[in-house]
A protein has these predicted regions:
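Residues that form or immediately flank small-molecule/cofactor binding pockets and catalytic motifs
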Residues: 86, 114-117, 194, 217, ...
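Catalytic subdomain that performs nucleotidyl-dependent activation
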Residues: 158-237
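A short, charged, Gly/Pro-tolerant segment at domain boundaries
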Residues: 241-253
Length: 253
């Protein structure tokens, strides 16, 4: 059973998501979260979903939304979260805050450890090796603990910036998908924030006082993604509707 529009507006859903008590940014995020889940059939009855919790605003908001969604009767889903620590990267997160945040939302948090040896393949960047090992750790944990879906906190901006990167550097119009079954694991990746704007998540994070993490990855700003985010912002200055044109190009052709 998929999540459908009728379910969202039943009494239980209305009780959990009282729009009249929400700030404007919260309403925008919730509406787009619901639309993404419905349009791309992301939630099904019986799903066991593991959220990849980095500690950033996007994954925190994803925890909050899916925790609320799990309290609705149909479709019934179970939600837990996992935070991965890379032991050989000087990257700090406030684990106590993440544990408290998940506990407040009724979500069990798993702390996982991983690492990588960059000398094994000098052709690969630290970012690639870190991401690959994080994903492998997450996938193996999910399978061994009976999860069938992994929820990632990528929003619409992330997906479109990836599209621009692939067009520019690979000559491909591929990008991250709202739902993606994995070939080598009995898992499906879902991105429930796929239609949500980053600016709205940022506003919610400020209004709800999400705690910003102490330090981000020291290699984050050296990637092409940071440069392409600037390009994306320039496109929106040229045309405020640019994101919707790009989305239609990829997902509505």
């Amino acid at each position: 059973m998929y999540l459908d529009k009728a379910v969202l507006w039943k009494k239980g859903a209305a009780f959990l998501f009282p729009f009249q008590n929400m700030m404007k940014a919260e309403q925008k995020v919730l509406k787009r979260f619901n639309k993404g889940c419905v349009d791309y059939h992301l939630l099904e009855d019986g799903d066991r979903i593991l959220i990849a919790l980095s500690g950033g605003k996007d994954s925190l908001e994803l925890v909050r939304l899916l925790a609320q969604r799990a309290r609705i009767y149909k479709p019934h889903i179970e939600v837990e979260a996992a935070h991965i620590i890379m032991d050989n990267i000087p990257y700090e997160t406030d684990r106590s805050y993440l544990q408290d945040f998940c506990a407040e939302n009724g979500i069990k948090l798993h702390i996982l450890h991983s690492s990588f040896d960059e000398s094994t393949d000098p052709r690969k960047t630290r970012c690639f090796l870190c991401t690959w090992n994080r994903r492998k750790t997450l996938f193996e944990f999910a399978v061994s603990h009976g999860f069938n879906k992994i929820a990632l906190g990528h929003h619409m901006d992330d997906i479109l910036v990836t599209l621009l990167m692939n067009i520019t550097f690979e000559g491909s119009h591929s990008t991250m998908q709202p739902s993606l079954p994995l070939k080598h694991y009995p898992l499906t990746i879902i991105r429930p924030l796929c239609l949500v704007h980053e600016a709205d998540i940022r506003q919610v994070a400020e209004e709800l006082h999400f705690t910003k993490q102490k330090a981000l990855c020291p290699y984050e700003e050296t990637t092409r993604r940071a440069d392409m985010q600037t390009v994306f912002h320039h496109l929106e200055q040229l045309n405020p509707e640019a994101r919707y044109s790009l989305w239609r190009y990829v997902f509505m052709e």
